[in-house]
């Protein structure tokens, strides 16, 4: 039973993290980790471990979120969470790699979004034009971009402060974006 931790702040924000949270709490208690250490660990998991890209907020006006969800299982959770975001326009910076079930993921993507199809800088990346063509099969419309940062910049340029920009589809896409953002600020 993890009820005693219900009010505890968990730094990882994705809806899917609730399942992970329960598993972590159970394991921590079995290992005899103190309540204080559990609370501190839950509140500072990203800072402590360096974990990034899990429903990570990058901006607020517009709301910008990135997530490394990259397969059908992850997108079952992400699609639900994205649908709950209140915004005027949902803008999806999206790319995938070649060993994932593109059809299964595409079927879960929001139909009412504007897409900025992209590709990460890895040999495994599916080209943005191939992803765009696959997206059209699912009624998803957008423009292809040769790299993540140009797709991201285009989405930000087009976005109003009341829009939502999501970056994801692949861990590589999120890594490319976060690397460029870090390089820009250091």
Predicted regions: what is each one?
Residues 4-114:
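Nucleotide phosphate-binding/pyrophosphate-handling subdomain across enzymes
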Residues 31, 82, 135, 159, ...:
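Active-site catalytic pocket residues across diverse enzymes, especially alpha/beta-hydrolases
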Residues 170-186:
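Glycine/aspartate-rich loop-and-adjacent alpha/beta segment that forms the canonical ThDP
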Residues 94-97, 167-171:
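Glycine-rich beta-strand-to-loop/alpha-helix junction loops that act as flexible
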Residues 98-100, 123, 150, 173:
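Surface-exposed, flexible loop/turn segments at secondary-structure boundaries
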Residues 63-64, 105-164:
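C-terminal helical cap/extension that packs against the catalytic core
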Residues 75-76, 102-104, 127-128, 176-179:
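Short glycine-/acidic-enriched loop or helix-start segments at secondary-structure transitions
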């Amino acid at each position: 039973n993890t009820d005693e931790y219900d009010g505890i702040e968990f730094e990882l924000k994705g809806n899917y993290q609730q399942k992970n949270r329960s598993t972590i709490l159970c394991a921590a208690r079995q290992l005899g980790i103190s309540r204080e250490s559990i609370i501190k660990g839950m509140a500072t998991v990203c800072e402590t471990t360096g974990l990034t890209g899990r429903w990570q907020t990058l901006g607020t006006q517009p709301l910008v979120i990135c997530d490394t969800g990259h397969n059908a299982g992850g997108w079952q959770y992400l699609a639900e969470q994205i649908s709950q975001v209140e915004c005027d326009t949902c803008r999806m910076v999206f790319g995938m790699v070649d060993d994932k079930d593109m059809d299964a993921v595409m079927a879960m993507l929001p139909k009412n979004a504007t897409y900025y199809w992209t590709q990460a800088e890895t040999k495994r990346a599916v080209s943005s034009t191939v992803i765009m063509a696959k997206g059209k099969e699912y009624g998803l419309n957008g423009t292809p971009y040769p790299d993540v940062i140009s797709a991201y910049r285009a989405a930000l340029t087009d976005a109003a402060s009341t829009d939502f920009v999501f970056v994801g589809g692949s861990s590589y896409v999120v890594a490319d974006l976060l690397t460029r953002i870090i390089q820009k600020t250091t």
